[in-house]
Amino acid sequence: MLKLFSAFRKNKIWDFNGGIHPPEMKTQSNGTPLRQVPLAQRFVIPLKQHIGAEGELCVSVGDKVLRGQPLTRGRGKMLPVHAPTSGTVTAIAPHSTAHPSALAELSVIIDADGEDCWIPRDGWADYRTRSREELIERIHQFGVAGLGGAGFPTGVKLQGGGDKIETLIINAAECEPYITADDRLMQDCAAQVVEGIRILAHILQPREILIGIEDNKPQAISMLRAVLADSNDISLRVIPTKYPSGGAKQLTYILTGKQVPHGGRSSDIGVLMQNVGTAYAVKRAVIDGEPITERVVTLTGEAIARPGNVWARLGTPVRHLLNDAGFCPSADQMVIMGGPLMGFTLPWLDVPVVKITNCLLAPSANELGEPQEEQSCIRCSACADACPADLLPQQLYWFSKGQQHDKATTHNIADCIECGACAWVCPSNIPLVQYFRQEKAEIAAIRQEEKRAAEAKARFEARQARLEREKAARLERHKSAAVQPAAKDKDAIAAALARVKEKQAQATQPIVIKAGERPDNSAIIAAREARKAQARAKQAELQQTNDAATVADPRKTAVEAAIARAKARKLEQQQANAEPEQQVDPRKAAVEAAIARAKARKLEQQQANAKPEEQVDPRKAAVEAAIARAKARKLEQQQANAEPEEQVDPRKAAVEAAIARAKARKLEQQQANAEPEEQVDPRKAAVEAAIARAKARKLEQQQTNAEPEEQVDPRKAAVAAAIARAQAKKAAQQKVVNED
């Protein structure tokens, strides 16, 4: 009974939610054996035919290449591509590739020479003697990738599995309508497929190996059972036909009952899955030593006269394959790469066959029905019932249209396998898969931008930290340099410290007084005499500077004399043209007379104290005398022209006379108390004498021109007489000085 339950559990099949049963349409192409296609004249090999980065070019334009020769180097996750035939590299340029928009990607263009010569092939028939790492490296360098549609590098996938893989699943379901490439491969090459499975099992060492195949492939099932008749390590599981049973998560659940977690991988639950075509490519790479240069492609559709499965070289233009199969295009003919549910329409037929190309569908005008217009969602939930990933396609549709990326991510849009079951059952003809693909692309772009921003932020923070460290180190160096003096500074500091210590030692020495000895104050006396000498030198220098400032400039003296003569002429002319009725203020005249007397006394004192060796310029003296005479005449004329009726306030006159006498006495006292060594500037004295003489002449002239009826003020007459006497004394003294 226990064995019965174990056997039942061993062959148990689980079922997933959702799924659809579309028309299979497989009988068009699975009835004919695999055949070869004649070589094309030109091959276009894109450098990137897999998930990941493209490899590094190792050929140049004009190089001769052989079939199987690497065109790129595979490093890390970069998968190399190989020449599909022998020929010459004519160009390395962007070319449209297998993409819904036919995006241009860098490609190697080879013109075939028709010989189809291989590179030397080194097969490992005894692969069991090779290590796991050697086998994985060979698979990777021979360009083997997942041929079921994803294109993930097989070597990287095997390396990532490690020792935690318990179940190896070979996907032979091939659930999508029209496609029969794996079915025909298992019918014609079942033994090679099983041998490739054994190589994978040798690398992974799983606990069990399962082959999942749908029950709509009876010939393939028979061939596999015949090959596995004597094997107990590989189990063949036949599952019901249901789309999409060939999905990785769906087939894993069907065969093991385990579900891949959201955002996780099948290896997280100890399961690794490979496609039938991938197992065949592994066998050819390891045992035969042949890189992947061709694959099985289904050519089907009512627009093709000879549908079937062919060995298509990678890089062969699609047009060449269709023409070889008898392609009869209609007016609005479409060609789909892949199946009707997960494939995409080609913009033109010059795109090449790549590693993930498994079918070329050329339907007639009415084979897939007329395209219908998209309508509004009616919330019928048919898409949710058909979704094999247990998602809510109608909600994802609204989130995608509304650009609500966060909500779409929260509703697990990344788990969508883009099987097209929701779009197939939608009564509103909404292309849901297209919306989901676009939303995934936008989310991926946003995440890529966030990643770049995070990297830029990390670089900025690292730079700021580096600058802070450099600044701190620089400040520390400056601080150390300031604290630690240089060698010469150390010597100077040491010398200063030595002097200080010596002085301190001298200061602490006791003063000893001996009888009969006198103290030695010579150093102090010498220092005092030096300070006195320095002070006398500074005073002498200052005195010389002051004496130099008093030296008369002969040019300046001549200029001043000329100015005085000009002023005297101008004054005489003004006096001659003066109107007789012009009145002179007697108070102002009295003040001017007193000032003139004071100046005269001061000038006499200065001339008496002047040094006899000092010479006075006679021209300058003559100028000053003329000016004095002119001023005197002007004053006399003003007094003579004064109106007789003008009365002078005796009190004001007395005050003015008292002020004049006080100023005169003060001036005489200052002159008497002056030091005998004080020297009077002879130029200034001569100028003042000339001014006095001019005033005297001016006063005389004014008195002469006065009208006879005018009365003369006796006080003014007395002032004028005093001025005249002072001027006469001054003139006599100047004459004596000039004669000396």
Curated annotation (Swiss-Prot):
Region named Disordered: 602-621, 660-718
Main location: membrane
Membrane topology designation: Peripheral membrane protein
Biased composition (Basic and acidic residues): 611-621
InterPro entries linked to this entry: 4Fe4S_Fe-S-bd (IPR017896), 4Fe4S_Fe_S_CS (IPR017900), Ion_transpt_RnfC/RsxC (IPR010208), Nuo51_FMN-bd (IPR011538), Nuo51_FMN-bd_sf (IPR037225), RnfC_N (IPR026902), Soluble_ligand-bd (IPR019554)
GO MF term list: 4 iron, 4 sulfur cluster binding; electron transfer activity; metal ion binding
UniProt key word Flavoprotein: no
Pfam family, one: SLBB
Residues that hold [4Fe-4S] cluster 2 according to the record: 387, 416, 419, 422
Coiled coil: none
Cofactor annotation: [4Fe-4S] cluster
Cofactor note: Binds 2 [4Fe-4S] clusters per subunit.
Its EC number(s): 7.-.-.-
Binding positions for [4Fe-4S] cluster 1 per the UniProt entry: 377, 380, 383, 426
An individual GO BP term: electron transport chain
Subunit structure: The complex is composed of six subunits: RsxA, RsxB, RsxC, RsxD, RsxE and RsxG.
Family per similarity comment: Belongs to the 4Fe4S bacterial-type ferredoxin family. RnfC subfamily.
Function: Part of a membrane-bound complex that couples electron transfer with translocation of ions across the membrane. Required to maintain the reduced state of SoxR.
HAMAP family linked to this entry: RsxC_RnfC
Protein name as catalogued: Ion-translocating oxidoreductase complex subunit C
Gene encoding the protein: rsxC
